[in-house]
Amino acid sequence: MYDFKKVEEKWQNKWNKSRIFKTDINKKKKFYNLEMFPYPSGSGLHMGHTRNYSIGDAYARFKRMHGYNILYPMGYDAFGLPAENAAIKSNVDPKKWTFNNIEIMKEQQSKLGLSYDWDREVATCLPEYYRWNQYIFLQFYKKGLAYRKEAMVNYCNSCKTVLANEQVVNGACWRCHNKVELKSLEQWFFKITDYAEELLKYLDKLSWPERVKVMQRNWIGKSEGTLVKFQLENSKDYFEVFTTRPDTLYGATFLVMAPEHPKVLELIKGTKNENDVKKFINKVVIEDKFLRTAEDKEKYGMFIGKYALNPLTNEKIPIYIANFVLMDYGTGVIMAVPAHDQRDFEFAKKYKLPIKIVITPKGKKLTSDKLKQAYVNEGVLINSNKFNNLLTGEAKNEITKHLSGLKLGKKTIQYKLRDWLISRQRYWGTPIPVIYCQYCGIQPVLEKDLPVKLPEDIKFTGQGNPLSQSKSFVNVKCPKCGKMAKRETDTMDTFVDSSWYFLRYCDPDNNKLPFSKKMVNYFMPVNQYIGGIEHAILHLLYARFFTKALRDLKMLNLDEPFHKLLTQGMVLKNGEVMSKSKGNVVDPLEIIERYGADTLRTFILFIASPEKQFEWSDEGIEGINKFLNKFYSLLENVSKKNDLIVESKLNRLIKKVTQDIEDFRFNNAIISIMEFSEYVKNKNYNKDTLEKLILMISPFSPHLAEEMHEKLGNKSFASISEWPKANESKINENLEKEEESVSNTIKDILNIKKLVNIENPKTYIYVIPKELEIYNQNKDGIKISTSSKDVKVYAVNDKLKHDPKNKAHKAKPNKPAIYLE
């Protein structure tokens, strides 16, 4: 048994001192390996982090040993609401809270023996980092990708602050428990919709899990259809409604708006319905968006007291708001055709709204009073004026052309994707670099004045916008006219920080630009990105958008940031995801203290393939610990030469383990190493064989590998040694088959012993002539393994053989006959 504590501390110190994992541009082929950087929470490293980093580090070590110039950095996604909440609850400085957590987390990561280039570390809350968030914002602003418009937000009147969705609990403010209402405020947006088509199209080029690509496709949500204008009654104003079914337009009997639609509050202002509609809105907007649109969710709505005109019939139709309509689809307003849409049908029945049939099956007649459910299939148009008798496919085109001629509609492509609202009424984020001047309007901060730093004279009360408290921050001269003006007091969404951090890693010390084009063009794209499926949409989509926008700003030559993506599975205990509330958390540091980092890493990679969830097992961790101690004991029995069979099996092992690790089948690779280690302990193996075996276990158990590598007399590091190459000419198929045959014969003898109940038999083995030599070579091994008094081997054609029961004739190739007495 080796002292894992001493060994792990020793090699972590040696790695740090020698800086063997430091990376720079060189002539080697590069490989950028990256895990999603963590938020430095107060709870520190959990088992999900540990799995993520163990996967990433094993792969980085493997690629490094293959001669790649590995970029493998780590940093911290350090802005965010938890730090601000801690400041409000405990009067703790968010900066101090965050850096204390970073220090703890970094120490925990170091104990795992991760091979990061720590010289490239970033923390997004440092001015040296968020200065470049602001710089990128200014470039986006110049290009028209950053703009300001009104948007609906959750607002707490009591705290006088905007709330994130997660801060609204059952319709109330998380802090004061007063009711939250929807309010329209001027907000900053990034124009991600400019890239909707490219974001969709380029998914096909990525080596990502199909389910992640499907999630992004659905989020972008491309639809081809018709944009139709519905004029408001007694007004020149109109709604644009997107529909994929213009053929049903004559059957539209009401409109339904999303409760969040900014025009709703305009329409009801000063009307008798205003208070009731506001109550309805506040009730609906706190519901989960996905649940609102679920098929089995009850559909409910409210008439807002206003009407629109059907553009083809000029009929007055009522306007409703309803829970099942979202701003995320189309224009946030739908035309309801209850005869031909089941959801609209149910809603119309519930609120006694007209149902008008405009499509019937060929040769059949439908009537509204006998309609039990919506008719949603194709058919022939009726009740549609000059378009009667057209088939639905033709009618779609003809009605769209007709609307276009009247300037009441046009063919269009719509995306579910919406522009990215980046404004946050928070302190602990990147200040938006904008100044408002009453004479000059919106003025971007000059680049030479970056970074706009967060003020430190803030009291965290949880009320109002924190930055607006600081007079020294807010009051500033206009960069254009020099008169007194006001700074923007919103900060950026923290997803901005993580949308380009992988680019900063390429050039972390650059104080002139976010990164140099040369560095990024060398290291990017990330060859292998590793992180949770929960980031499949927002983070990964925003990072892709940033990369494309920065390309168009000539800051890099790159279309996509991440070539390959691996989404690791959850770690469960007792069949549930680990969480403090469930009392089923296993602390990685406790496991490291008890068994060592190598045991923890190897267990995590052994128990399941990376993309699968796995169940924690105390017995499993103990089993791996025993295996590593046995592996260490292989140092004790090194011979001067290899058995030929060992040479063959070693080269087969190298080939298999290499391919398994390349394909992220770490569990299969570890099992193969275990099997070979168990096999070889009873064979003659030389120093070279053990050396290669040590290098193969190095990605999983790097400390143990370094120690054993050194014990064999090596002065170099195992971590940067060359990966073993399989010599296929040394793989001897026949020899391995023969040995397998001997192994199976031993099992057969043991089974016969049980059946005839002989403890120490005389064993007679009858083989075909060409197998006589291999069995004679293994006689002693068979004798020991089967506890036989003696073992005799005969060729089946040997006339002098001892064969009292006439067993010899039963012998077959690789299947000897056996007799015990």
PLM region descriptions:
Residues 1-30, 258, 270-275, 353-365, ...:
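Basic, alpha-helical terminal appendages of large translation-related enzymes
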Residues 10, 14-18, 88-242, 246, ...:
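Residue patterns forming the tRNA-binding/recognition surfaces of aminoacyl-tRNA synthetases
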Residues 56, 69, 264-361, 367, ...:
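Catalytic alpha/beta core of large soluble enzyme barrels
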Residues 24-92, 121-136, 243-244, 311-347, ...:
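N-terminal catalytic cores of NTP/NDP-binding nucleotidyl/phosphoryl-transfer enzymes
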Residues 2, 222-227, 360-363, 369-401, ...:
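Long, charged, mostly alpha-helical binding arms that flank functional sites
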Residues 1-34, 64-73, 97-104, 208, ...:
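Conserved oxyanion/phosphate-binding beta-strand-loop segments in alpha/beta enzyme cores
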